[in-house]
Amino acid sequence: SQMLKDEASLSRAKMSKIDLANVVDSVVEDFNSDLLNSNKNIKINVNNSNLNGSKLNVLGVESKLEQIIANLLDNAISFSPSNSKILVICNIKKKNAQLIIEDEGPGFNEKNIDKVFNRFYSNRPEKFGEHSGLGLNIVKNIIELHGGSITASNPRGNKKGARIEVLLPIYK
């Protein structure tokens, strides 16, 4: 499959210093303009305020980082009810760039939450239609090739939705 070939090409691709917050902004901008033309009325909000204007540099392949963000946003959108918001937060956590994506959808099934990154595992209720389940597995592989990690959780408290956290080493 194309995505698996992409994965192999990443290990050979040239990595460079990239401002992750910039990549997030441009991907979200594209998604928001597409969402304006959809009838679900979903808005993606980015919160970079914790960065205080400093760059969120990581060592990576820009097209792959875009692919990760797009894939995670795609998932969030497909699980989101109409008239809801998706929150994207960029932050610094210890020595990592932190990217959090939270939606207001049904959230993860708690007992299968550690399986969501497995290949071919799909957490989708039937009404979301067919899905290969490859998405999160490939996202995880690309993130790990960048020296990072990804975790899934349900936001604490009685908030609905799913929360994905990506950590990538900060590149000085």
Language-model segments: what does each one mean?
Residues 83-95:
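Short beta-strand/loop element within the Bergerat-fold HATPase_c
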Residues 148-149:
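Conserved glycine-rich
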Residues 76-77:
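Short helix-loop "hinge" at the ATP-lid/N-box region of the Bergerat-fold HATPase_c
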Residues 108-120:
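Short conserved segment of the HATPase_c
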Residues 34-49:
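Short conserved segments within the C-terminal catalytic ATPase subdomain
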Residues 8-13, 53-60:
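Conserved micro-motifs of the catalytic ATP-binding
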Residues 103:
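Acidic ATP/Mg2+-coordinating residue in the GHKL
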